Amino acid sequence: MKDSFTVALIGLGNRGKDAYLPEFLKYGGKVRVTAIAEPVDEKRNEVAKLLGLAPEQCFRTGEELLAGPRLADAAVIATMDRQHVPQAVPALQKGYDLLLEKPVSPSLEECDLLARVARETGRRVVVCHVLRYTAFYKKVKELLDGGAVGQVMTVQAIENVGYWHQSHSFVRGNWRRTDESSPMLLQKCCHDLDLYLWLAGKSAKRVSSFGSNSFFNAAHAPKGAAARCLDGCAAKADCPFDAEKIYLTNAATGIDAGNDGWPCEVLAAHPAHDSVLDAIRTGPYGRCVFACDNDVVDHQVVNVEMTDGSTFGFTMTGFTEHNTRFARFFGTAGELSADLLSGDITLTPFGKPAQVFHIDAAEGHSGGDAGLVKAFVELMLGGEPGSGLTSLDVSLESHRIALAAEKSRLAGGAAVELQ
């Protein structure tokens, strides 16, 4: 066992700076951040000051950081989807172990390339499929593995993206276009697909899918809608997607309600009423949701046939009040429902009373962010990798399913065989 290790952070956005860095700092001297890369000067300078880094430890891009000698034992790659593999390959070749943000890549060829380089270099890659690391889903796994419902025959699951999250990230935000990021099912739900395969202990054989961007387009703009929410929009009062409501006044998401975290921290490095208002006035997050250049889906369904003949139905939709997940597992001896919003896991053995297990939610993907970093720290310090560790090889099946589903969707729902 090692006493400590060093890490380089590539990408200081919502995941790198706001999710993972605070978790690493909880480990004190066991984890030291020795290099950072971030193109936004304000973010880079702020983190450099926090960590006491010298100028030669700070870079504008991951490419600049990786061009020189190795600066840490491990690297966290938390950049945009299409940057992951072009940065991860040279990082592995330089000798870094990796904590890699999802998705690995929208290209299966790149996924396979990265897996090959990881094998050739003998380096470790952990993919940020954070849901496996929550106490909630670990309990679901314990019950299912213990035979609580018998053999799982059918899984039904839904990701409630949330109306404001859909508009924030996938209509106005960085993940609104497939050509700039990846298909929405891959970017948003690859860790859901990974989760349910792991929970049920299954592998996929065949996939079909339907979905589209049916609503967030010009055809659905209400009468009197303006190009920007602050440009005298006549539909503003009745529009739930109004940027002022989401970022200023909404009780759950608005800065005026005291929410200076996500999503407001995406609009301004130090969110306050004036800085958020200015971002709405001048930036992409103030655009009308019916006048953006988005092309990713706003809803999608996926049907999966497993290799053992069991089935999995998954729905992703942006048309929900809450941002949460719900699943049901139907087995030969009972059924189990998992409601992440309430924290309740309800087990109903056939012919017997139901049992309810309550798991209190935690911050950061219900505690998944903290659990992921803990598992990575333990791995880097020399501990044994846990059975739920989301290694690269394990994680790629979810990517194959997501990309097969996108292929099916674009082909009108035709079934796609998985190799």
Name each model-derived stretch.
Residues 113-130, 150-157:
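Rossmann-fold dehydrogenase core element
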